[in-house]
Amino acid sequence: EYRNLHILGYSFSTGPSPLSNLCQEMRGRRNRRKYEIMDYLRSKGVDIPLEEVEALASGGVVGRPHFAQVIVRHGYAAANHEAFDRWLDTEEFQEINNRFKVDARTCVEAVKAAGGKASLAHPYQMKLEDEALSALVGELAGYGLDAIECYYPRHTAAQQTLYLRLAEKYGLHITGGSDFHGERVKPDIQLAALELELEWLL
């Protein structure tokens, strides 16, 4: 229902757990998804080599940023964000993407079962009205959500204020991030520093 809902996990055990099982399942889903993405892109006239996309992932899970970089490399878009706007973040693409997702409750509960803390990442991406977002955060808090990412480069001042208010309303901790995924994945985003109270993660 919420197309860009991301859950971050902190301080979880890396041993066998429902979370490790879920991650293994998701890797399998992502591996199958890449072939459907290739078919989708070709149907739009974007013909790129899958081998180049896989090479960017360096043996890891292939994601949309890898596709975006290769799309740019082959001249179909001028920048990664254009590749997302035109193909990789459209309603039509989400119909493909949604078949490979896991619901938020499963994610939160898996992180918690592994002894970790769960945070809702970059809430602005869900493009929800304030009341709808508040209801969603309340629902996630009921599943055991620990925090909400209030500080993020693309959050406006008004959005940041709203998220801080929601954190207070639902008794959630505050996290922040730059969305840095490495130079090969998101070369236009640099690792940033942010001072926050993080004793709750220990």
How would you label these PLM feature ranges?
Residues S20-R29, A55-A57, Q94-E95:
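Flexible, glycine/proline-enriched loop segments at strand-loop-helix junctions
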Residues A57-P123:
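Conserved acidic, metal-coordinating active-site core of Asp-based
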